[in-house]
From Swiss-Prot:
SUPFAM superfamilies referenced in this protein's UniProt entry, alphabetically: dsRNA-binding domain-like, Ribosomal protein S5 domain 2-like
One GO CC term, this protein: small ribosomal subunit
Protein name: Small ribosomal subunit protein uS5
InterPro entries xrefs: Ribosomal_Su5_D2-typ_SF, Ribosomal_uS5, Ribosomal_uS5_bac-type, Ribosomal_uS5_C, Ribosomal_uS5_N, Ribosomal_uS5_N_CS, Ribsml_uS5_D2-typ_fold_subgr
Function: With S4 and S12 plays an important role in translational accuracy. Located at the back of the 30S subunit body where it stabilizes the conformation of the head with respect to the body.
Domain S5 DRBM residue range list: 15-78
Family classification: Belongs to the universal ribosomal protein uS5 family.
GO BP term (any one): translation
Gene3D superfamilies associated with the record: 3.30.160.20, 3.30.230.10
Organism: Chlorobium luteolum (strain DSM 273 / BCRC 81028 / 2530) (Pelodictyon luteolum)
GO MF, any single term: structural constituent of ribosome
Keyword terms of this UniProt record: Ribonucleoprotein, Ribosomal protein, RNA-binding, rRNA-binding
PROSITE patterns listed in its UniProt record: RIBOSOMAL_S5 (PS00585), S5_DSRBD (PS50881)
Length: 171
């Protein structure tokens, strides 16, 4: 199977899917209304890989299947340390803003709606989140994924700065 942009092979991962939202659309034609559906699906292995997809079709099941296929093409790696994220993130997509804060073990996944689905599929167990601005599930999911993409763990920071881990934590 082909690699995604980050070199992740979705075929080698044990991806599960979670349906976030289904929307029914209508097209008015001469004989009445034609209904279509679109589905937002989040896929992940609950071990640090997560992606989202949008599927559109005339039937709900077909839309979900297309969403899953699209989600497998957009899988990203999320650094998870002791069940939480390494640092606080504020991510924005459109007018949707998502704030994610690391939490101590035992706190649980405190998130609502679309953000919860993304974090569950990523495998994050302890995190505090707040969704601000738009509650449109399309934009909230995209903001959450953008935030998770932007996380950098200490090894990445040390490599970018050409320093050791000890030097990074001292500065």
């Amino acid at each position: 199977m082909a690699k995604t942009a980050k070199g992740i092979r979705p075929g080698e991962l044990n991806l599960k899917e979670k349906l976030v939202h289904i929307n029914r659309t209508a097209k008015v034609v001469k004989g009445g209304k034609r209904f279509g559906f679109n589905a937002i699906v989040v896929v992940g292995d609950k071990e640090g890989h997560v992606g989202y997809g949008l599927g559109k079709a005339n039937e709900v099941q077909d839309a979900i299947a297309k969403g899953v296929e699209d989600g497998k093409k957009n899988v990203v790696k999320v650094p998870i340390i002791k069940g939480t994220i390494p640092h606080q993130i504020v991510a924005k997509y459109g007018s949707a803003k998502v704030l994610m804060k690391p939490a101590t073990p035992g706190t649980g996944l405190i998130a609502g709606g679309a953000v919860r689905a993304v974090l569950e599929m990523a495998g994050v167990r302890d995190v505090l989140t707040k969704s601000l601005g738009s509650s449109n599930p399309h934009n909230v999911v995209k903001a959450a994924i953008l935030g998770l993409k932007s996380i950098s763990d200490a090894n990445d920071v040390a490599e970018r700065r050409s320093k050791s881990l000890k030097e990074v934590f001292e500065s």
